[in-house]
Amino acid sequence: MEKELKKILSILIAMMLSVSLMACVKAADSQTQTKEEDNLLSGKHHVTITVQDYGDINVELDADVAPITVTNFINLANDGFYDGLTFHRIIKGFMIQGGDPLGNGTGGSDNKIKGEFSNNGIENNLSHTRGAISMARSSNNDSASSQFFIVHKDSTYLDGNYACFGYVTDGMDIVDKICANVKATDDNGTVAKNNQPVITKIAVID
């Protein structure tokens, strides 16, 4: 009987600890979200993506439509996160994708962000037309971190499912050259490591 009581007591203690840990995690999430909201950008912002051996791609970002996405992207750029990374996935007629520190589509930054698109409960009227910049993600709507893609040809079927956050204002000829010159190793657009175009820097203009 005594052994059974001890066993029940240990189970109850374990359950209480589990609940307290969950409460701590929820509190931390709430504090992080509040902090993010307090520091979100607004308005239009501009960045230049310099690609080694190709040139500059100038992009206008819309923080009024996608404040979480733009703020995250600009913070990473200002921290130098993208410097030296690559475009690891290229599909001519669709898009070029980069921003993965592992260079294989599985990596990202330490921070995952809310997916700002309609099928995730957030209004976003930016369309995935030629020149759009948008966040790559996994099947989890809130899994985007650092990987982004630039649309090569109109792909409006992506609207509502991916967080478009701006458009190329100058340099689509660079995207055209990358799509024309870089050959993928499979139908998924995988580019061999030694052939991946290098992002020298993403400079934040304003």
Regions of interest found by a model, annotated:
Residues 5-12, 18-206:
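Cyclophilin-like peptidyl-prolyl cis-trans isomerases
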